[in-house]
Amino acid sequence: MTKNSSTVFTHARIATLEEKAANLGLIEEAALVVKDARIVYAGPENKLPDEYASFEKIDCGNRLITPGLIDCHTHLVHAGNRAHEFELRLQGATYEEVARAGGGIVSSVRNLRAASEDDLVRETLPRLDALIAEGVTTVEVKSGYGLDRDSEIKSLKAARRLGEERDVAIRTTFLGAHALPPEMNGDKAAYIDRVINDMLPAIAEQGLADAVDGFCEGIAFLPDEIARVFDAAKAHDIPVKLHADQLSNLHGAALAASYGALSADHLEYTDADGAAAMASAGTVAVLLPGAYYFIRETQKPPVEAFRAAGTKMALATDNNPGTSPLTSLLLTMNMGATLFRMTVEECIAGVTREAARALGILDQTGTLEIGKDADLAIWDIERPAELVYRIGFNPLWKRVFKGQI
């Protein structure tokens, strides 16, 4: 298929993921038409308009078409790994002991600062390729391991380059308020000053951030410190999102909602009031079962409270070197179901429609509706539940990005 090709996918089953449709919007004996990288028809094959008769045809053999998958929370750009720390923790070392030995996020900061932009792109591409191989068409990538202006800019530029190296959409997020760098000697107020007066203006001027994020936690930054960052982001007209309530309830979910955040992420310790605030604000709950699993957390996010409040839920890998070295959205869906008791429908919507909502791009992608980008994943499966049920098996038949296979 060429960039401006016109193609009909025939003999398919289609899960449109439309907002109000039941059963994932599943249409049997369906066809989907792509023209100029957009979806122009998705519906019963026997109602296919005659105007598409001359288009190139691809027989899907009764396979299932879903929207291309979206990984809406990653720290994909990083240098090195922390496998040695993993071994130390298995031997009983605490996080504090690892940090005192020069590990933890400090080691990731040290590695990233030492790497060139080219190094970062080269090291990140295999992780990105692993996601693409599972039908992922959009990936969010955060900075946050540089923690100074030049290194944060380097990270975001490397992330943007990933979208030039591969057929994938990249959404970049500035996460300067991720941790306190060692050179600040514990002075969080002075560091937040740097984030809002030095880093953010330079990043905004270069148009490098689609969103601004922060880590609201006792080991990172408190709500009043995050609020300063969010006020600055709003002044630059950049939407916000937040790592919230992962290790304790600092009411980060409610803070995110008060700023109309695109999403609040992690949320293991969020309470019912936080869930309700998010629902009212339209803030998506991005759940990250990979991190929950990897750090052996026991407090589950309040899925029932999110359901009761009507809070939208997404799933993501949270790929990062310290707490979730995960590059599989398929496994993430299984974890969402088995660990968090999410339904099949919630899991699949969580890596398509709701993931798009969490990035503020639901008008472009995330469902198979007329006018949206032709980002598709075609699966050799009999029923949608297989995407969530299987572990370590990839049933992807074809991946289509903006109309191109």
Swiss-Prot record:
InterPro entries hit by this protein: Amidohydro-rel, HutI, Metal-dep_hydrolase_composite, Metal_Hydrolase
Reactions catalysed: 4-imidazolone-5-propanoate + H2O = N-formimidoyl-L-glutamate
Organism listed in the record: Brucella abortus (strain 2308)
Superkingdom of this protein's organism: Bacteria
Pfam family of the protein (one): Amidohydro_1
GO molecular function, one term: imidazolonepropionase activity
Gene3D superfamilies given in the database record: Metal-dependent hydrolases, Urease, subunit C, domain 1
E.C. designation(s): 3.5.2.7
Entry cofactors: Zn(2+); Fe(3+)
GO cellular-component term (any): cytoplasm
Residues noted as binding Fe(3+) in the record, renumbered to the chain: H73, H75, H243, D318
Binding sites annotated in the UniProt record for N-formimidoyl-L-glutamate: Y145, N320, G322
Keyword check for S-adenosyl-L-methionine: no
Known pathway: Amino-acid degradation; L-histidine degradation into L-glutamate; N-formimidoyl-L-glutamate from L-histidine: step 3/3
Residues annotated to bind Zn(2+): H73, H75, H243, D318
Keyword Nucleotide-binding in record: no
Main EC class the enzyme belongs to: hydrolase
Protein name: Imidazolonepropionase
Cofactor annotation comment: Binds 1 zinc or iron ion per subunit.
Key words of the record: Cytoplasm, Histidine metabolism, Hydrolase, Iron, Metal-binding, Zinc
Family: Belongs to the metallo-dependent hydrolases superfamily. HutI family.
